[in-house]
Amino acid sequence: MRTRITAVLAAGLLAGCQNQAFNEIGRAPAMSPIGSGLQYTQTPQLAMYPKQPRHVTNGYSLWNDQQAALFKDARAINIGDILTVDIRIDDKASFENETDRSRKNSSGFNLGASGQSQTSDFAWSGDLEYGSNTKTEGDGKTERSEKLRLLVAAVVTGVLENGNLLISGSQEVRVNHELRILNVAGIVRPRDVDADNVISYDRIAEARISYGGRGRLTEVQQPPWGQQLVDLVSPL
């Protein structure tokens, strides 16, 4: 029995040692290799977008249908091109709900009987009452405030059949022993990219924007993995 318990504890210790944070004790968090977050493959879900009709370009014309204007700098339109994503998120939301419900019910009835015989008299009576009372109250309030202003360069990783672009970009900034990571990905239209080769985040379809980090401060803010496991399986 002791051998089994020791084996279980050793397995748990080894599982915890495999954590990346364990390997970074006494050192700053390591940065990811350049280009590790880029994927140049198109997923099957993108087949829902229609194909772009082919346009015949005359050899003597200076106009390009993939550009919004003639006398402006070229913007990102091909795989491998780079454009800048302007992220300016300033959202506030407040929700408040209140519920009050009550119900009261009561009922009762009487029973009685009497009789007489040659030897004795008898009488019997009884009362029965019952009631119920239920009450439910609920009050909930949620407030959220988010503000984020960043510029990040993204790479065109794919071109859909209708001409829209798949973009993906990441940025890592390490300050002391804390690594801040910004990831952005989505689908953009070439015409939405302005003359400075910049696109706003609200022009990105299927946008995936994440801003987080890794390091000592993040580890302190997160509960230990053992406590997270107990919270997950605990019925109370």
Swiss-Prot record:
<keyword id="KW-0998">Cell outer membrane</keyword>
<dbReference type="GO" id="GO:0071973">
    <property type="term" value="P:bacterial-type flagellum-dependent cell motility"/>
</dbReference>
<keyword id="KW-0449">Lipoprotein</keyword>
<comment type="subunit">
    <text>The basal body constitutes a major portion of the flagellar organelle and consists of four rings (L,P,S, and M) mounted on a central rod.</text>
</comment>
<comment type="function">
    <text>Assembles around the rod to form the L-ring and probably protects the motor/basal body from shearing forces during rotation.</text>
</comment>
<keyword id="KW-0732">Signal</keyword>
<keyword id="KW-0975">Bacterial flagellum</keyword>
<keyword id="KW-0564">Palmitate</keyword>
<protein>
    <recommendedName>
        <fullName>Flagellar L-ring protein</fullName>
    </recommendedName>
</protein>
<dbReference type="GO" id="GO:0009427">
    <property type="term" value="C:bacterial-type flagellum basal body, distal rod, L ring"/>
</dbReference>
<dbReference type="GO" id="GO:0009279">
    <property type="term" value="C:cell outer membrane"/>
</dbReference>
<feature type="lipid moiety-binding region" description="S-diacylglycerol cysteine">
    <location>
        <position position="17"/>
    </location>
</feature>
<feature type="compositionally biased region" description="Polar residues">
    <location>
        <begin position="105"/>
        <end position="122"/>
    </location>
</feature>
<feature type="lipid moiety-binding region" description="N-palmitoyl cysteine">
    <location>
        <position position="17"/>
    </location>
</feature>
<feature type="signal peptide">
    <location>
        <begin position="1"/>
        <end position="16"/>
    </location>
</feature>
<dbReference type="GO" id="GO:0003774">
    <property type="term" value="F:cytoskeletal motor activity"/>
</dbReference>
<comment type="similarity">
    <text>Belongs to the FlgH family.</text>
</comment>
<dbReference type="Pfam" id="PF02107">
    <property type="entry name" value="FlgH"/>
</dbReference>
<feature type="region of interest" description="Disordered">
    <location>
        <begin position="96"/>
        <end position="143"/>
    </location>
</feature>
<dbReference type="InterPro" id="IPR000527">
    <property type="entry name" value="Flag_Lring"/>
</dbReference>
<keyword id="KW-0472">Membrane</keyword>
